Amino acid sequence: MTLTKWALPLFFLFFYLLPLDQRPLWSPDENRYAEISREMVSTGDWVVPHFLGLRYFEKPIAGYWFNSISQQLFGDTNFAVRFASAAATGLSALLIFWFALQLWQCRRKAFLASLIYLSLLIVYGIGTYSVLDAMVTLWLNAAMVSFYIIRKEGSLGSRIGGYLLFGLACGMGFLTKGFIALAVPVVVIVPYVIYQRRLLELVRFGPLAILSAVLLAAPWAIAVHLREPDYWHYFFWVEHIQRFAADNAQHKAPFWYYLPMGLLGTLPWLGLLPGALRKGWQERKISPETLYLLAWVILPLLFFSIAKGKLLTYILPCFAPLAMLMAANAVDLLKEGKERAFKVNAWLNGLFGLICLVVLAVLAFSPSHAVYGEEDQGALAVAMVIFAGWSLLGFIQLKEVSRRWTLSALCPMVLAIGLPWALPQSLIDSKLPERFIEANQAVLMKSGTLLANDVGLASSLAWGTQRSEINLFDSKGEVHYGLGYPDAAGRYVARADFPAWLEQARKNGQVALLMKTDRDGNTGPVPTADETIVSHRLTLLIYHGAQ
């Protein structure tokens, strides 16, 4: 791979931006964020987040702002929904390039750090997926980079400006995802400055960072409090304390959860990981920058491992410094003529592709584990081509590995290009209901009232029909809080109340109920519909209006 100034921009263009519009939105996350921002644009309310027309206090506002601006620029498209995440990832890669250049004065290390970062499986997956983690990671990366730069000796004015900038980055992180965005800088920087015996400097200048962060966040924080006095109570206690520390925390997982998931996320560069960490540990006492990067990787990982609530996206901030450590070690190994790590990495990619091919074969031909049905033969073929390509890209490096090792960056890109055409219909109906909704758009648009028995389905309906008032049937899900307000009365229909409610609703026109059923297609007890449309686990019940 030739090192040119166009390589990274072209890589980002072809493998990040161009595929964004090729696959439907995944439920529930992408539909949720798409719909929240669509409602923000349509209502003009840029202060209080709403979802399905209901108050939704799960996150602060900045991520929704960026998504809404994207929709204003690019329309109600899947590209627009994902653009903010992709753009944030690209800016993180640019920041990594600049920071690596400052640390090592080596363009090759800077280039490889950015390339490795962009092609990490976890970074690519989250960076082309509409969630807030790529955006908050950008602000955390900016905060961590700015702090390391200002820790160097400089004039009083430059230090003051640097700490103010550090605070602004932390403030944007807070406005994007809340208090948890402040945890990463704290758990890394405080131990680091104590180890470096520079705690007094942090005590002297740290309040400036706090001041700039508070001044940045205060206008919206005050505005949302004046509009919705319960916002901060719910956001702090439910979305932070209960999610991360309480016994009933969301997404509970064992302490070691991030170890296997993190290793998988480092593909296609897993073979470079042990050497990078080992060298970082060996150089921690003689290289301040290496110690800083190592702390940036390990301490947030430990923090999120201790928390009871865990999601893979939480550890995304650990991968910018990890990419830099791997790139620096790779360049040093090449200078020393050592190829073992690159050969191991090539073998790992080759074997990973082969293992995935075997798993696909089992899923395709085992009656008890079948995922691909008779109608999915084309999708199965594409999936096999994807992992055969991944394997081939690994094995062809073994000849002249010192020249070809960067081909590993293309492994996830084969997956990125082929994925939209490799999904079985059962998965599409379960996780990508957009296609089913598009196929039944006419009958849905004729319906005066729309219901769904799942919040993810409701958000898909809202996005697909451009209607926010989708009623919830039999399950309140993540909007239970918003449904508790008096002005949301009537937005939820219990199963026991459905027959009587339906009789009244049909007087105002056609009613459509979209349901996600169990694997046997059971809808449970509901009145017999005038029309029934079924596709795998999706069932659409149409009740004509009363004559």
Swiss-Prot record:
From the UniProt record, give one GO term of the biological process aspect: lipid A biosynthetic process
- A GO-annotated cellular component: plasma membrane
Report the subcellular localization: Cell inner membrane
Cross-referenced InterPro entries = ArnT_tfrase, Glyco_trans_39/83, LipidA_mod_glycosyltrf_83
Give the catalysed reaction(s), semicolon-separated.
Answer: 4-amino-4-deoxy-alpha-L-arabinopyranosyl di-trans,octa-cis-undecaprenyl phosphate + lipid IVA = lipid IIA + di-trans,octa-cis-undecaprenyl phosphate
Listed GO MF terms: 4-amino-4-deoxy-L-arabinose transferase activity; mannosyltransferase activity
| Keywords in alphabetical order | Cell inner membrane, Cell membrane, Glycosyltransferase, Lipid A biosynthesis, Lipid biosynthesis, Lipid metabolism, Lipopolysaccharide biosynthesis, Membrane, Transferase, Transmembrane, Transmembrane helix
Predominantly, its location class is: membrane
Give its E.C. classification number.
2.4.2.43
Pathway assignment reads: Lipopolysaccharide metabolism; 4-amino-4-deoxy-beta-L-arabinose-lipid A biosynthesis
The answer to whether keyword Cell inner membrane applies is: yes
Q: What's its membrane topology?
A: Multi-pass membrane protein
Top EC group = transferase
PANTHER family, sorted: MANNOSYLTRANSFERASE YKCB-RELATED (PTHR33908), UNDECAPRENYL PHOSPHATE-ALPHA-4-AMINO-4-DEOXY-L-ARABINOSE ARABINOSYL TRANSFERASE (PTHR33908:SF3)
Its biological purpose is as follows: Catalyzes the transfer of the L-Ara4N moiety of the glycolipid undecaprenyl phosphate-alpha-L-Ara4N to lipid A. The modified arabinose is attached to lipid A and is required for resistance to polymyxin and cationic antimicrobial peptides.
Q: Which family does it belong to?
A: Belongs to the glycosyltransferase 83 family.
* Record-given protein name: Undecaprenyl phosphate-alpha-4-amino-4-deoxy-L-arabinose arabinosyl transferase
Q: Which organism is it from?
A: Aeromonas hydrophila subsp. hydrophila (strain ATCC 7966 / DSM 30187 / BCRC 13018 / CCUG 14551 / JCM 1027 / KCTC 2358 / NCIMB 9240 / NCTC 8049)
